[in-house]
Amino acid sequence: MHITILNGPNLNLLGTRQPEVYGATTLADIEHMCQRKAQALGLEIEFNQTNHEGVLIDQIHAARSESDGLIINAGAYTHTSVALMDAVASVSLPTVEVHLSNIHARESFRHTSFLSPVALGLICGFGATGYVMALDGIWAHLTAADSARP
């Protein structure tokens, strides 16, 4: 099974950007954590980051033919992008939305997610561990779906 993990704007600055909110873990550290977890689960992953909404949409579209599932931390686009929501909905892949911080405990504008209505699940507030939790969750979902098939 192949999982695409997408990261949106400003996540390339993890480790130095607002460590009191996002922690000291870098995106490279998170990718390494995900690689280790994926290997343990027998998954292949593709891990990407971009600061551009259109690139995220293109990557979601590409995942349609390359992946069995999608994990996305869309950063601030979570709260603003109908286009990302439409892209996720259009590819019909099980999708887990991830946020390092608890978006519901922050500013009120962060309480709205355009992705949650089209996602299988949402993990927020657990820092970098949320990505590992997302891999566990999507693996469990996919293997349950496989075992339910005749």
From Swiss-Prot:
Query: Per its UniProt record, what InterPro entries does this chain match?
Result: DHquinase_II, DHquinase_II_CS, DHquinase_II_sf
Q: Which reaction does it catalyse?
A: 3-dehydroquinate = 3-dehydroshikimate + H2O
Q: Which GO terms describe its molecular function?
A: 3-dehydroquinate dehydratase activity
User: Which superkingdom does the taxonomy of this entry point to?
Assistant: Bacteria
Instruction: State what protein this is by name.
Output: 3-dehydroquinate dehydratase
Q: Where is this site: Transition state stabilizer?
A: 17
- Per the Swiss-Prot or TrEMBL record, the active site comprises 22 (proton acceptor), 99 (proton donor)
Biological process GO annotation list?
amino acid biosynthetic process; aromatic amino acid family biosynthetic process; chorismate biosynthetic process; quinate catabolic process
Binding positions (substrate): 73, 79, 86, 100-101, 110
Q: Which organism is it from?
A: Dinoroseobacter shibae (strain DSM 16493 / NCIMB 14021 / DFL 12)
Give the enzyme's EC designation. Answer: 4.2.1.10
* UniProt pathway annotation: Metabolic intermediate biosynthesis; chorismate biosynthesis; chorismate from D-erythrose 4-phosphate and phosphoenolpyruvate: step 3/7
Q: How does it assemble?
A: Homododecamer.
> What does this protein do, in the record's words?
Catalyzes a trans-dehydration via an enolate intermediate.
The family classification in the record reads: Belongs to the type-II 3-dehydroquinase family.
Q: Which UniProt keywords apply?
A: Amino-acid biosynthesis, Aromatic amino acid biosynthesis, Lyase
